[in-house]
Amino acid sequence: MTLAELLGRSRIAQVANNHKPLTYTGKKFHPTHQIIETKPSTLYRQEWGLKSAIPSKIKSRYLVYNDLDTLERITTFEPRGGTQWNRLRFQEMGVPIVSNIGRQNPFFKYISRPEDESHAKLSLFKEMKGDTDISPAAMKKRLKKITALIRSFQDEFKEWLVENHPDELKLNSNKLEDYVVKFLNKKLETKTNKKFNTEIIGTGGLSYSLPGKLKNSPNGVIQRTVVPGRILNVVKENNDNKWLAAIGGFVADVVFFQSPPSSFNSMGDFIRMKTFLFEILEASMEKNGSVSMHARLLEPQNDKTREFFNKRPIYKPLTSRRARRPSVGNIQEANNLLNIIKGN
């Protein structure tokens, strides 16, 4: 059996389990189910790589499902791929996902090492610090874990003290306490430095481009990302009007240069029928998986601005073109040529 035949006959064995229903009507900030895509050639044969067959009436290339196989030999699925199209639209915009304001990027996170005794004492509680919104029960459990870890170091501490500071065994307890802090800090530091940093900034597969990267075009370097969108509605927030826009399948906060145009209020709900141009300022991924996007409305030119651009002088090119000969000279040359032919 060739590799192509093996891949053609292979089936999906397991995916991430999801207990949420396919027709979930609650508030969703991110896709909840994995999407399966098939190519047009395999869609004609109703081949999805699943254990059970899909009805022939399904014409969509994208499926979301919960169970690969049931007792009835049926896959619980829905022909829905809306999130897939949103991802493709976002990738076409080419906007990079940036970290939230005030949050340090873990890819360039600087892990400081304790240098003096005050930092050493603080590093003992590195494992106990955790998140700010941790519950008291979880903090108590973590404290119990750290206490058991410290007690397990008693024999090692005695050996370390005899080996490095044998004369300090006769000193008072205050001096001995400093050596305990030094020893525990050394043990905890060696363990925490080897631990892999699990805090990462995900992009949800929306974009893998880096911020600040230049994008070229036939007209030069692209400095701004301008995309079409539609004004949705106005939301009251802190006694101010907050305008929202639909851009690439996402809802973005609209920023104006000065103030919203007066025509927006007069158009009412019919404003959604008109398309405007927006400049994407920033797109970030929140902790709950939602995408926060800010865009600036590029207002159309008014009459004065359009008149100013029309009155600009048109500069002639520096390289002069060859002057064309008048048509009269061409006719005379043709007549002379005919006379020469007739004379021969």
From Swiss-Prot:
Q: Which residues carry this modification: Phosphoserine?
A: 327
Principal location class:
mitochondrion
The annotated subunit structure for this chain is: Component of the mitochondrial small ribosomal subunit (mt-SSU). Mature yeast 74S mitochondrial ribosomes consist of a small (37S) and a large (54S) subunit. The 37S small subunit contains a 15S ribosomal RNA (15S mt-rRNA) and 34 different proteins. The 54S large subunit contains a 21S rRNA (21S mt-rRNA) and 46 different proteins.
Q: What is this protein called?
A: Small ribosomal subunit protein bS1m
A single Gene Ontology biological process assigned to it is: mitochondrial translational initiation
InterPro entries xrefs: Rbsml_bS1m-like
Other comment: Present with 656 molecules/cell in log phase SD medium.
Query: Is Ribosomal protein one of the keywords UniProt gives this record?
Result: yes
Query: Changing residue 260 to L: what effect?
Result: Suppresses defects in the 5'UTLs of COX2 and COX3 mitochondrial mRNAs
Please provide, in alphabetical order, the Gene Ontology terms of the cellular component aspect for this entry: mitochondrial inner membrane; mitochondrial small ribosomal subunit; mitochondrion
Q: Where in the cell is it found?
A: Mitochondrion
- A Pfam family this chain is assigned to: Mit_ribos_Mrp51
Q: Which GO terms describe its molecular function?
A: structural constituent of ribosome
Q: Does the keyword Ribosomal protein apply?
A: yes
Keywords of this entry: Mitochondrion, Phosphoprotein, Ribonucleoprotein, Ribosomal protein
What is stated as this protein's family in its record? Answer: Belongs to the bacterial ribosomal protein bS1 family.
Q: Which organism is it from?
A: Saccharomyces cerevisiae (strain ATCC 204508 / S288c)
Per its database record, what is this protein's job? Answer: Component of the mitochondrial ribosome (mitoribosome), a dedicated translation machinery responsible for the synthesis of mitochondrial genome-encoded proteins, including at least some of the essential transmembrane subunits of the mitochondrial respiratory chain. The mitoribosomes are attached to the mitochondrial inner membrane and translation products are cotranslationally integrated into the membrane. bS1m functionally interacts with the 5'-UTR of mitochondrial mRNAs.
